[in-house]
């Protein structure tokens, strides 16, 4: 560990000498980029070394459209391709994500022996970039398909019903290369500057939708919700320890953001609070998870007919679109 720290400091000193040396280098501008500015040595950041700091965030809708235009210049597009509409549906995408999106769409078009990209190609590549490649060759049993269909339908219903987290873009029971048995992909419709307590609670509720659907339908539960539970727990913990969203804990930051393992940093993690506070934090996290679990159970139980209809459609088609999913609710309202 001392050796790692020594090498890290050596690199810092070397860069400092290279930047200002023992004389003056006229006409030389030093530029650098990092996504971890918080761990940089202050000596590197002092005036005279890096005088101007520019934060480059994720592009907004206008920026995404301009980036798409750049990457579309060398790709023939069909008449139905609308770059503005694509920009609207790719909130949160980076420039690299958008480039990858069009590259994947071009591959889809080439595989279908087409000389140009159509909107359907982009829809397919959107899922691949957002979720990962589908592995249609993987064989799963009918029982596993049914469990997965109920699991994903549970997520989808909550995405649709809860006002701040939807709508659904695609629901699938086709396994992915990342190891998931299926996926439910939401469609962000606008850029968000910040999150709210209400929306975060809805996100946790959606995370628990798959497990709730399994509990309501089957006599047993599966390991398929492990990642969902991990996400829900992390979000609940952030609400309690980082964002001051727990009345019991109060407006105090207990998050250990500076304890991440990094080259040159101590590997030992320390906690800035005692066991009593730790117990309160755990209790608050459990309370949030339990309340969201009950909310998910209430909503899915009230939409049991849509749950069953969605499962039936998924078992028939394996993947359904937003329009097909929303039609299930429209048919329900007509009963």
Residue map of PLM features:
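Conserved C-terminal "switch" segment of AAA+ ATPases
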Residues: 23-29, 42-43, 56-123, 128, ...
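A short beta-strand-to-loop transition that corresponds to the Sensor-1 phosphate-sensing loop
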Residues: 32-37, 59, 161-162
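Soluble catalytic regions of large protease machineries
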Residues: 147-149, 156-335
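Short regulatory helix/loop adjacent to the ATP-binding pocket of P-loop NTPases
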Residues: 37-49
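Short pre-active-site segment immediately N-terminal to the catalytic Zn-binding motif
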Residues: 136-147, 192
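Substrate-engagement module of ASCE P-loop NTPases
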Residues: 11-27
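Single conserved hydrophobic/aromatic residue that forms the stacking wall/gate
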Residues: 2-13
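Residue-level signature of catalytic and energy-coupling elements of molecular machines
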Residues: 15, 34, 50, 64, ...
């Amino acid at each position: 560990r001392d050796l790692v720290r020594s090498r890290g400091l050596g690199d810092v000193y070397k860069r400092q000498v290279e930047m200002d040396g023992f004389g003056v280098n006229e006409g030389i501008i030093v530029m650098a980029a990092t996504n971890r500015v918080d761990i940089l040595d202050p000596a590197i950041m002092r005036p005279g070394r890096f005088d101007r700091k520019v934060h480059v965030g994720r592009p907004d809708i206008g920026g995404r459209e301009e980036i798409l235009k750049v990457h579309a210049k060398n790709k023939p597009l069909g008449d139905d391709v609308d770059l503005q509409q694509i920009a609207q549906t790719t909130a949160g995408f980076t420039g690299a994500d958008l480039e990858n999106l069009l590259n994947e769409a071009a591959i889809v078009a080439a595989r279908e022996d087409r000389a140009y990209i159509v909107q359907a190609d982009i829809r397919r590549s959107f899922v691949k970039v957002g979720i990962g490649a589908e592995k249609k060759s993987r064989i799963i049993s009918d029982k596993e398909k049914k469990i997965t269909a109920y699991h994903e339908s549970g997520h989808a219903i909550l995405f649709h019903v809860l006002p701040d987290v939807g709508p659904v873009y695609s629901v699938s029971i086709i396994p992915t290369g990342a190891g998931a048995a299926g996926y439910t992909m939401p469609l962000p419709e606008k850029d968000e500057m910040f999150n709210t307590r209400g929306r975060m609670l809805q996100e946790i509720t959606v995370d628990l939708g798959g497990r709730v659907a399994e509990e309501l339908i089957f006599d047993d539960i599966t390991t398929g919700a492990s990642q969902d539970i991990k996400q829900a727990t992390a979000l609940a913990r952030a609400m309690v320890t980082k964002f001051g969203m727990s009345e019991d804990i109060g407006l105090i930051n207990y998050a250990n953001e500076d304890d991440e393992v990094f080259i040159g940093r101590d590997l030992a993690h320390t906690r800035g609070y005692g066991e009593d506070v730790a117990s309160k934090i755990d209790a608050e996290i459990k309370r949030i998870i339990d309340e969201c679990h009950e909310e998910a159970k209430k909503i899915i139980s009230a939409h049991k007919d849509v749950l069953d209809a969605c499962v039936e459609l998924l078992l028939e088609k394996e993947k359904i679109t937003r329009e097909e999913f929303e039609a299930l609710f429209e048919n329900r309202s007509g009963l």
